[in-house]
Amino acid sequence: MKTLAWVLLLLCTAATPLRAAELELDSSLNETVLMIPKQGLFTIKLETTLYKPEGAGPFPVVIINHGKAYGDPRFQDRYRPLSGVRYFLQRGYAVVVPMRQGFSKSEGSYIGGGCNIESNGEVQAGDVKAVLDYVTAQPWADREQMLMVGQSHGGWTTLAFGTLNYPGVKALVNFAGGLRQDQCTAWERGLAIAAGSYAKATRVPSLWFYGDNDSFFNTSTYQGMHAAYTGAGGQARLVAFGKFGSDSHSLFGARAGEKIWQGELTTFLKSVGLPGEAQSALAKYGKVSGMAVPEKTEFAALKDDSRIPFVRDTGRAGYKLYLNKPIPRAFAIAPNGAWGYADGDPDPLKRSLDACNRNGKAQCKLYSVDDFVVWKED
């Protein structure tokens, strides 16, 4: 029996689900992680990542709110939207990225609110408010110069937060915001109705980014939300940028998306009296090093895991996990069936190869980067 177990172990090891190890804090971005208390009937702590420019401040503050991946929120990684982080650090902002209750290492349980999408956003916004209450008590925070940003479910959270009209928060930025609820009848209409309700109570302007090949929200869905929001008196400028890659939902996290959103955001920030231009003295925060991204190939469609060479069922399952990770990301494979992936900066390409090569005998090559396939047959 021991021999059989050892043989099985060897067979499994050749295709180990090799995810890159959890990242160390990036000292070049002054990255730290705090556990911020949220008071209530029971006090819970919210895992929050902080990035600050060097110096004592006070700095303008931006909160960046995360989305919701499929599956158990507790297994969701700590959100590190480094493209956005670098953009704001170069402009002198302190960047605060909270994980809401039930997500990652935050305590408490995720409260979905069933099919009541309006209530869902309000509950999420309550967690963000608790973090901002803590932040505004810190000497490094400029309480008069604050911005709320969010992507996907975080964008919806941002719109809900707008109803609080929190002192010092000058504007809202919504990247592909919403919450897809296929189990709920007419959930798209529910989003529009809730957006209109939020607008009635919100006094600050907002900037919205949506694309036409979004895997969560189609064109009619986001147009309906925007029409309801502005029709109810909300101030919302929509940037409808068309198609982006294989899924426009990934715009905010993709380096290729920066040229679409950064110029629009800079103009918007200046229009509401917030810092918008990068400072030359802070240029170091914008530098990204790492492997060059290979060119896209036509070997296979991104989501067609049946075409991936070498890997067994565990590798195909790992690839499905990889596809749910935020951009930037990379997936690597080897002829012996080994595989590995990594997401987030720094350099997910190198880290995915390193993860794969733990069992890949230095023969690993990249199969996919971000939202395209780069594999070439020999």
Segments and roles (model prediction):
Residues 116-139:
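Alpha/beta-hydrolase active-site loop
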Residues 58-67:
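Short beta-strand element of the alpha/beta-hydrolase
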Residues 103, 279-378:
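Secreted/extracellular ectodomain signature
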Residues 232-290:
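C-terminal catalytic histidine-bearing segment of alpha/beta-hydrolase fold enzymes
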Residues 21-56:
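N-terminal cap/lid segment of alpha/beta-hydrolase-fold proteins
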Residues 69-81, 87, 97-123:
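Cap/lid segment of the alpha/beta-hydrolase catalytic domain
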Residues 171, 177-237:
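The feature captures the conserved acid-bearing segment of alpha/beta-hydrolase catalytic domains
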Residues 140-151:
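Alpha/beta-hydrolase fold nucleophile elbow
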